[in-house]
C-alpha cells in the first residue's frame, strides 16, 4: 500500500517579505551614512562695520566635511543676493583664512568674475553656488590642491566672485582652473575672465590691476 509523502513547499510570500525587509534595512542604513568630502571646508561671513577692525568684521560661520553637511549649511544661510552691500561670503579650506596675509594666500591670486548690477538677480546666486560646488567637488582634477577658496563680494557698483589659488606663478594649474571654472559657469567663449595676483591687487585699484592670465 502506497503511503503519501508529506509535501514540502516553500511559501513564496515569506521569502519576498524577507527580501523587502533586507532592502529596507539597506536603504535605512544609507540614510545615516554621510558622504565625506576630500577636504574640510570653512564658511566665513564678513560685514563691513566701519566702527570695527577688518578682522573683527570677519566671522567664522561653520565648518563641514561631508556632502550632506554642505547642503544643510547652504540651505540654512541667506542667498548672496539677499546680503547687504559691503558683505562677503568666503569658503576656504580648513586652516586657510580668507585674507591675503595667510601663508597659503600671500603668493597667490584669483580668477575674478565681475557682475553688473543687473546680473545680481539673474546670475549671482547661480554663479556662487556653482563656484562652491567646484570647490567642494574638487572639480579641477590634479590642480584642485592649488585652490585655497572662493569669495563673493556684494557691492553697490557691482558684485564680484573669485576663486583664490595659492601660487600665481603656477601657470599650468592656474590656466586649467580658469578654463574649467569658465566652462562650469557657462560663461560665453567671447567673454574674457582674468587672473590677478594678490600682490598686484593690494598695490593698485581693482580697475587698473593687470591680468597675469586670461581665458
UniProtKB/Swiss-Prot annotation:
The protein, known as: Eukaryotic translation initiation factor 4E-1A
Keywords: Cytoplasm, Initiation factor, mRNA transport, Nucleus, Protein biosynthesis, RNA-binding, Translation regulation, Transport
Entry keyword annotation includes Protease: no
Region (Disordered): 1-23
Domain of life: Eukaryota
Cross-referenced PANTHER family: EUKARYOTIC TRANSLATION INITIATION FACTOR 4E RELATED, EUKARYOTIC TRANSLATION INITIATION FACTOR 4E-RELATED
Biased segments, Low complexity type: 1-14
Source organism phylogeny: Eukaryota, Metazoa, Chordata, Craniata, Vertebrata
Keyword Protein biosynthesis: yes
PROSITE patterns hit by this protein: IF4E (PS00813)
A Pfam family recorded for this sequence: IF4E
Organism of origin: Danio rerio
Any one GO molecular-function label of the UniProt entry: translation initiation factor activity
Subunit annotation: Interacts with eif4ebp3l.
Compartments (UniProt record): Cytoplasm; Nucleus
Amino acid at each position: 500500500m502506497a503511503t503519501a509523502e508529506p509535501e514540502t513547499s516553500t511559501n513564496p510570500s515569506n521569502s519576498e517579505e524577507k527580501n523587502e525587509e533586507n532592502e529596507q534595512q539597506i536603504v535605512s542604513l544609507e540614510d545615516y551614512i554621510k558622504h565625506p568630502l576630500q577636504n574640510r571646508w570653512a564658511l566665513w561671513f564678513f560685514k563691513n562695520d566701519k566702527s570695527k577692525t577688518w578682522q573683527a568684521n570677519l566671522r567664522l560661520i561653520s565648518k563641514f566635511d561631508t556632502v550632506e553637511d554642505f547642503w544643510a549649511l547652504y540651505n540654512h544661510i541667506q542667498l548672496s543676493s539677499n546680503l547687504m552691500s559691503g558683505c562677503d561670503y568666503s569658503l576656504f579650506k580648513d586652516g586657510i583664512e580668507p585674507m591675503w596675509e595667510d601663508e597659503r594666500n600671500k603668493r597667490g591670486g584669483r580668477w575674478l568674475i565681475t557682475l553688473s548690477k543687473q546680473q545680481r538677480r539673474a546670475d549671482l546666486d547661480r554663479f556662487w553656488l556653482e563656484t562652491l560646488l567646484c570647490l567642494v567637488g574638487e572639480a579641477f582634477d590634479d590642480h584642485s590642491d592649488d585652490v585655497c577658496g572662493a569669495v563673493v563680494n556684494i557691492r553697490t557698483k557691482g558684485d564680484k566672485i573669485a576663486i583664490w589659488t595659492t601660487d600665481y606663478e603656477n601657470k599650468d594649474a592656474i590656466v586649467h582652473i580658469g578654463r574649467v571654472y569658465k566652462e562650469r559657469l557657462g560663461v560665453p567663449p567671447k567673454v574674457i575672465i582674468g587672473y590677478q595676483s594678490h600682490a598686484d591687487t593690494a598695490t593698485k585699484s581693482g580697475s587698473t590691476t593687470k591680468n597675469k592670465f586670461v581665458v
